[in-house]
Amino acid sequence: MTKVKICGITTLEDALMAVEAGADALGFVFFEKSPRYIGPEAAARIIRELPPFVQVVGLFVNAELDFVNRTADTCGLDLVQLHGEESPAYCGLVRRRVMKAFRVRGAESLAALADYKVSAYLLDAYSPASHGGTGERFDWDHAVAAKGQGRIVLAGGLDPDNVAQAVAKVAPYAVDVSSGVELSPGRKDPEKVRRLIAEAKKIALI
């Protein structure tokens, strides 16, 4: 069954709602230029209130390695998501499992995956203006082609209306959704979250 990560969590209310709806993982954005940014101390307070067995992911963009590792320790992160131009060597120095994000323009965007030995590869739509959370889609055929590299996490423009189609086509390890389930940047719509998770997970039941 495809796993679901709800990213851009900024409040305890949204975190607990997403977990209750069946989210497997929650994402916290530690990139100050993002409208979904949350500071490490604020994130840690939310994370301490979560029930067990929920994976906690920290998203970073071209951050200093020391900041990444300190934040991982402060927050008790299970996984670090790197959304910038971090090198394979940098990934190897992170003291957590790493999910490396790649912004997909076309098939040529997939060549770099082979250079990275990480826990998962997140594929997102390319945007010159943003490192994710744009609500834009890319050609899912590229995600299908990338599956030979390892665990694929599908992102980019997913919402309750198209996630079942995406899961049926790609059969990714997980889907990662932020703007597709929001009321406004950083605040989640409970109905959209519940519907998206149900749609993403129903494929395995058919």
Curated annotation (Swiss-Prot):
List the protein's name: N-(5'-phosphoribosyl)anthranilate isomerase
* Keywords for this protein: Amino-acid biosynthesis, Aromatic amino acid biosynthesis, Isomerase, Tryptophan biosynthesis
GO BP terms, alphabetized: L-tryptophan biosynthetic process
- The answer to whether the entry has keyword Amino-acid biosynthesis is yes
Spell out the HAMAP family in the cross-references: PRAI (MF_00135)
Q: Which CDD domains match?
A: PRAI (cd00405)
Catalysed transformations (reactions): N-(5-phospho-beta-D-ribosyl)anthranilate = 1-(2-carboxyphenylamino)-1-deoxy-D-ribulose 5-phosphate
The UniProt similarity line reads: Belongs to the TrpF family.
- In what pathway does it function? Amino-acid biosynthesis; L-tryptophan biosynthesis; L-tryptophan from chorismate: step 3/5
**Pfam families in alphabetical order:** PRAI
Which EC numbers characterise this protein's activity in its record? 5.3.1.24
EC class (word): isomerase
